[in-house]
Amino acid sequence: MKIAILNDTHAGIRNSSEIFINYQERFYDEVFFPYLLENDIKQILHLGDYYDNRKFINFKALNRNRHHFLSKLREYGISMDIIPGNHDTFYKNTNDLNSLKELLGHYMNEVHIVMEPKVVTYDDLDVALIPWICAENYQKTMNFIKECKAPVCGAHLELAGFEVARGQACHDGMDHKIFNKFELVLSGHFHCASQRDNIRYLGSQMEFFWSDADDPKYFHVLDSSTREVTAVKNPLRLFERIKYDDTKNEYFDYDVTQLKNKFVKVVVANKTDPFTFDRLIDRIQNEDVHELKIQENFSEFIGENVVDENISLEDTATLLDTYVEAVDTELDKKKIKSQMRELMREAQALEIS
């Protein structure tokens, strides 16, 4: 038996922007469901964060998600097991009130919501499913892990030391050794894929922020017989970063058609010919891009008046961490950084409407 695995699909992300709703629809219509139909896959396992906003969801996003995802489950005879992620729960200390139970009730024949840690059997493979761990279910989850005999675990975990985004590690969270007893742990939550020991963060299947640019996205298929996990690439890109250096590259014949309906950032390393640069920018703007940002190289301004010459001007998270480190306080700086990053993510989610 083969099980398609999704996680962190975030319906309604970026303030329920039409851009992201259309992008998600393309993924399901052009990539995900065609693969499932071609390979006769009838089971989905969703590892949390089905919805994006833990407080509310836009009716437009809800309607579109029903049409391009939930109705397809019924149409194609596909079942889905799902655990709540932190974005699916209203409160941070309990999973009891969550969007999955409130909004997916019409599809209970197709969607099975797993609210408590439990073992689900897919043919001959037992998989331990662990919802988002919070204060209320922590001890119950620890007891479940201690007694569990399943070789594979599917969860929505926040583990210390793993990458939240490329080059940005989670400074707090649980010790991953708690899950040492499992042969394989598949987790959602962090949007970039990574692996250490028996822990495999699958990463998001789609691009939602600039941190996702140049970070390949996949959905996954678990074979219950072999326990092999196959990554299936999502070829649809939404963010495109161009590193401009006219001392090394020619741009007169640069294919700008690939940039249509994308967010584009031109990072200028060297610009010796302003005419060539301006012509490229004009051509990009004529392609109906969602947004064009130009990031100039300000290295000439970095000198003795700047304390840290290694700060990346495009990495907001690094700037926030650097600022917190420079503050003279007895408060827990790891917690402050975590809160700052959470506020940054919430601000990014509200950026586009």
Language model region names:
Residues 2-3, 43, 125-126, 152, ...:
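Structural motif
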Residues 165-230:
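Conserved beta-sheet core of the metallophosphoesterase superfamily
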